[in-house]
Amino acid sequence: MNRYNDKQRIRDLYDRTSPYYQSLWGAHIHHGYWISGEETKETAQNQLIEHVASAAGLGPGCKILDVGCGFGGSSIYLAKKYGAEATGITISPIQVEMARKAAAAEGVSAKFLLMDAEEMKFEQTFDVVWSVESISHYPQKEKFFAAAAQCLEPGGTLAITDWFKKERLAEREYEKFIRPIEKGMLVALDVMEDYMALLRSNSLQIVHNEILNKNCSKSWDLGLDILKNRALWQIAAEYGVEFLDFLRAFRSMRAGYASGNFIYGLLVAKRI
C-alpha cells in the first residue's frame, strides 16, 4: 500500500464526491470508448461497457458481480441490455444508496451491497466478475484476485479494466506523470504484467489482453471541460485539500495519456 490508497480515505472521498461526480459525469463513473470520435460522452461510456462485455463473452441472463460498482450504472445497463442478474458492491454507503435509487428508477432488480472487495464472500457463485476502474484503489490487490477467483463458477470469467503505469518507468517520469494521479485519485498504479501474474497465480487463464488508450483518452479532454465549472472548485474548496487534489488529477490524467506513461488496459481471464 502506498500512502494514497487507504480504504478510509477512499470511502470518505467517494461518500463526499459521488453526488457531484454524478451530476457532472452522468450515470457511469468510468471512461468512454470512442469508435468514430464523434460520439457523446454517454454513448462512449455505454460503448466501453459493450466492448468489455464482448471481450468477456457475456451471455443473456448471466449472473454478474460488479465489483466497485459506483452508482450502479454498469450493473443497471447490463441488467437491462442482457437480462443479467447483477449484484454490485462498493465500500461507499452513499454509492450503495445512489445505486439502489437508480435501479428503482429504471425498474431494474439489481442488488447493491456495502462490501470490501478484498474480503468479499458470497454463498452463490457468478458467471462473471466485472471490475471497471476499481482495483487500482485496493491496498492488497492479491486479496481481491484470490476472492474473485473463489466467486466464479468453474469456467467463469473475470473481466477487468484498470489504470496502469508504463513498464520500466523512469523515476523522473513517475514523479511528473504518475504520482499526481496516485495522489489525486487515491490509487496505486501497477504495470499490467503485475495483474497478469496475479491472475495466473489464482488459476485464471488470460484470454484477452488489450490496451485501450487510443479509444479512451478523450475522456480526459471532457474532464478538462468539467474543470471549467467554477462552482465545482468552490465546492471542492469547502471539502478540503483531497477534493482539490482529485480535481487537479484530471489534468494529470490527460498528461499521462499524452505522454504514454499512463495505460488504460483490459484483461479478461477464465477460471480453470
Residue ranges, per PLM feature:
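Conserved alpha-helix/loop element of class I SAM-dependent methyltransferases that forms part
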Residues: 28, 39-60
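Short alpha-helix
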Residues: 187-203, 209
